[in-house]
From Swiss-Prot:
GO cellular component, one term: cytoplasm
Subcellular localization, as worded in the UniProt entry: Cytoplasm
Annotated catalysed reactions: [protein]-L-glutamate 5-O-methyl ester + H2O = L-glutamyl-[protein] + methanol + H(+); L-glutaminyl-[protein] + H2O = L-glutamyl-[protein] + NH4(+)
Similarity section: Belongs to the CheB family.
Encoding gene per record: cheB2
Protein name: Protein-glutamate methylesterase/protein-glutamine glutaminase 2
Keywords: Chemotaxis, Cytoplasm, Hydrolase, Phosphoprotein
Post-translational modification: Phosphorylated by CheA. Phosphorylation of the N-terminal regulatory domain activates the methylesterase activity.
UniProt-listed SMART domains: REC
InterPro entries from the UniProt entry: CheB-like (IPR008248), CheB_C (IPR035909), CheY-like_superfamily (IPR011006), Sig_transdc_resp-reg_Me-estase (IPR000673), Sig_transdc_resp-reg_receiver (IPR001789)
Residue span, CheB-type methylesterase domain: 155-341
Length: 341
């Protein structure tokens, strides 16, 4: 029996790039490019005519930007969208407007960059085709813990992939200065992790920064693993630090959640809370199991609230997750755990 192909609409104002995209993703037999469009208005007509399963969308376009198009489209016609973006903070506006994920634009003059780009884009189109679209629930606030020095010996570790930037924001935005030091791996390319950290820092009470080698893990601070670097937690002179080094991909990712979680299990043991959020694949499941075996408390995002119920599902089936919660309850569950520490 032949499986149904993923009907894909390409939206980009460059004729050359549209044609290159169409050729590149059509090489995968699971994907069918049903139409291309030069701008948002043509895209609207193509959506009505072809009813695509997934749309790729440029951020910068004439007449109407990709972000504005998303804001108008999603309430009326929810559709899985993968953004194609140059290195720009606007990609996070697109994710906030409802895009599932993004891919960084390649150097068109380098075949190696193009091959890597198409492999990533094809994978993300496939992930988007099974992603769950829906309205975001309001997240309960993480209240002050009333703790001080005791929390300095504790660490919160979070891992996420597809759908993660928004999920992480919904949790971290309610952190306060009494929240234990937090380390996060979000699958994201180099450059974008710095902009994501800066964006969170501008909108959250706690300090959020892209981690650098030998940064200390502090209360009321969040460290985001830099793209193309593996981040590990280490204990030195009674303090937690992070080591960030370029490394090989693990589970297809650098940074990888498993690398972080394994190091948290080794360095923090029972003095940690691990949280695995939305994302495709299995990254983080094995590391979260190591954390739980070391005595850490572990939380998984539930299926109903995930954009893609992959990583949390594998972790849950592996026995790594102590309890699953909807995204809008994870903050409250974390608050309760912190007060039990």
């Amino acid at each position: 029996m032949r499986l149904r192909r993923i009907k894909t609409l390409i939206v980009d104002d460059s004729l050359l790039f549209r044609e290159t995209l169409a050729r590149g993703i059509s090489r995968d037999p699971a994907i069918e490019v049903v139409a291309t469009a030069v701008d948002a208005f043509m895209a609207r007509d193509m959506i009505i005519k072809y009813k695509p399963d997934v749309m790729t969308l440029d951020v910068e376009m004439p007449r109407m930007s990709g972000i504005e198009f998303l804001r108008r489209l999603m309430p009326q016609y929810p559709l899985p969208v993968v953004m194609i973006s140059a290195l720009s903070e606007s990609v996070f506006d697109a994710l906030n407007a409802g895009a599932i994920d993004f891919v960084a634009k390649p150097d068109m003059n380098r075949n190696r960059d193009l091959d890597s780009f198409f492999s990533e884009l094809i994978l993300k189109i496939k992930i988007a085709s099974v992603a769950r679209l829906g309205r975001r629930a309001e997240v309960s606030k993480l209240l002050p813990t009333g703790k001080s020095q005791a929390d300095q010996g504790w660490v919160i570790a979070i891992g996420a992939s597809t759908g993660g930037p928004e999920a992480i924001y919904q949790i971290v935005k309610n952190f306060n200065q009494d929240t234990p030091g937090t380390v996060i791996v979000q699958h994201m390319p180099a450059g974008f992790t710095r902009m994501y950290a800066e964006r969170l820092n501008d909108t959250c009470v706690v300090e959020v920064k892209e981690a650098q080698n030998n940064d200390q893990v502090k209360m009321g601070q969040v460290l985001i693993a830099p793209g193309e670097y593996q981040m590990r937690l280490k204990q030195k002179a009674g303090n937690y630090m992070v080591e960030c080094h370029p490394g090989e991909k693990v589970n297809g990712h650098c940074p990888a959640v498993d690398v972080l979680f394994d190091s948290v299990a080794q360095s923090a043991g029972a003095r940690a809370v691990g949280i695995i959020l939305t994302g495709m694949g299995s990254d983080g499941a094995r590391g979260l199991l190591a954390m739980r075996k070391a005595g850490a408390r572990t939380i998984g995002q539930d299926e109903a609230s995930c954009v893609v119920y992959g990583m949390p599902k594998v972790a849950y089936e592996l026995g790594a997750v102590e309890k699953q919660y909807p995204l809008n309850y994870i903050g409250q569950a974390l608050y309760k755990l912190i007060n039990q520490l």
